Amino acid sequence: MKILYYDCFSGISGDMHLGALVDLGVELEYLQKELAKLPLEGEYELSATTVSKSGIRATQVKVKLREHHHHDHRTFGNIRAMILSSALSLRIKERALKMFQKIAEAESRIHAKPLEQVAFHEVGAIDSIIDIVGSAIGLEALGVEKIYASRIELGGGFVRCAHGLLPVPAPATLEILQGLPIGLHGVPFEATTPTGAAILACNVDSFSGSLPLSPQKIGYGAGEREGVDIPNILRLILADEPVQPSPKEVLLETNIDDMSPEHLAYAVERLFEAGALDVYMTPITTKKNRLATKLSILSLLDKERELTQILFQETSSIGLRRLEVEKIALARRFIQVPTPWGEVSVKLSMQGEKVVRYKAEYEECRRLAMTHSVPLHTLYLAIDKAVESCLNDTNH
């Protein structure tokens, strides 16, 4: 499994994150091409340089603003409309908007303002829009299946912003990171910004200081701080996660011959809501040639008790069969493919490095088909051609 690990010993900011992504292999030209889909032409320049931090080579990404362009008070509504109206892929839009929403909600609570009216003094500035949307682009380009992170160093001291002098961590940063593992005063400056906090809060699947990793590539992104004891860098580790035994699963089954279809359907909904991995019904014939339904529930062991209780509450069953099972599954990863109507996410099923089958994300296809009034099968034919072309290019 391809994973990404954030080592946040010196915190994280938007520019550090972009630098680490570029250092890890996301092409700067690709970022520039994708970011050009936002209506910000002529307002900024994006550059990357190699620097040294405490003797460690790192990539520093900078967003240089054109002085005649200033929109420091864009609202969340303005930013959302900008992203939604762009030609970015659906997955990139969703990832970027999730991060902006997180920051907007934090600012809304802190300043007691309606969400849509929150003025993004810093996040609404062009450089922060580039940081967040660029992060979404870079993460999608890496195509990782899981994202993990260490404890997040926040720093200490004070920071000057649009609202005056504030203690570190800034209120928005702390609000965003509620419930997540943090460290305070490890460095005498603002180590983690609200943008960096949102990147972690919205994209990391799990926080852990120790993971069984097999590193494949390491990227270092440089911050602006100089002359500090701890290097002001973010370290990203692209790795393969060693194959772990899959969690034990249990198959619960019962035969039912005296319930209405409506009640059975409701029971299935309850089981899915409670965390069943799969629930399915099979028509069967029982003793005395009675027509019946076999209800099958696939569950993780830690959900078995709750699902069993729901089964007895919502069905007429007075007993069930139980069998522990193991699942074998192909590795999966996502790619973005172009069509005449927009980009679509496609899930590849892999055996080693070989793609054995692929499937487009249905909801994205449905939206494109409805938006552009194109037959769904026509869209799928275009996707087939795009995927085959992409795979042929990769093989060559």
Curated annotation (Swiss-Prot):
Keyword vocabulary terms for this entry: Nickel
Regions that span the bilayer: none
Domain of life where this protein originates: Bacteria
Keyword GTP-binding listed: no
GO molecular function: lyase activity; nickel cation binding
Keyword Hydrolase: no
Family per similarity comment: Belongs to the LarC family.
NCBIfam families: nickel pincer cofactor biosynthesis protein LarC
HAMAP family assigned: LarC (MF_01074)
Protein name: Putative nickel insertion protein
Taxon lineage: Bacteria, Pseudomonadati, Campylobacterota, Epsilonproteobacteria, Campylobacterales
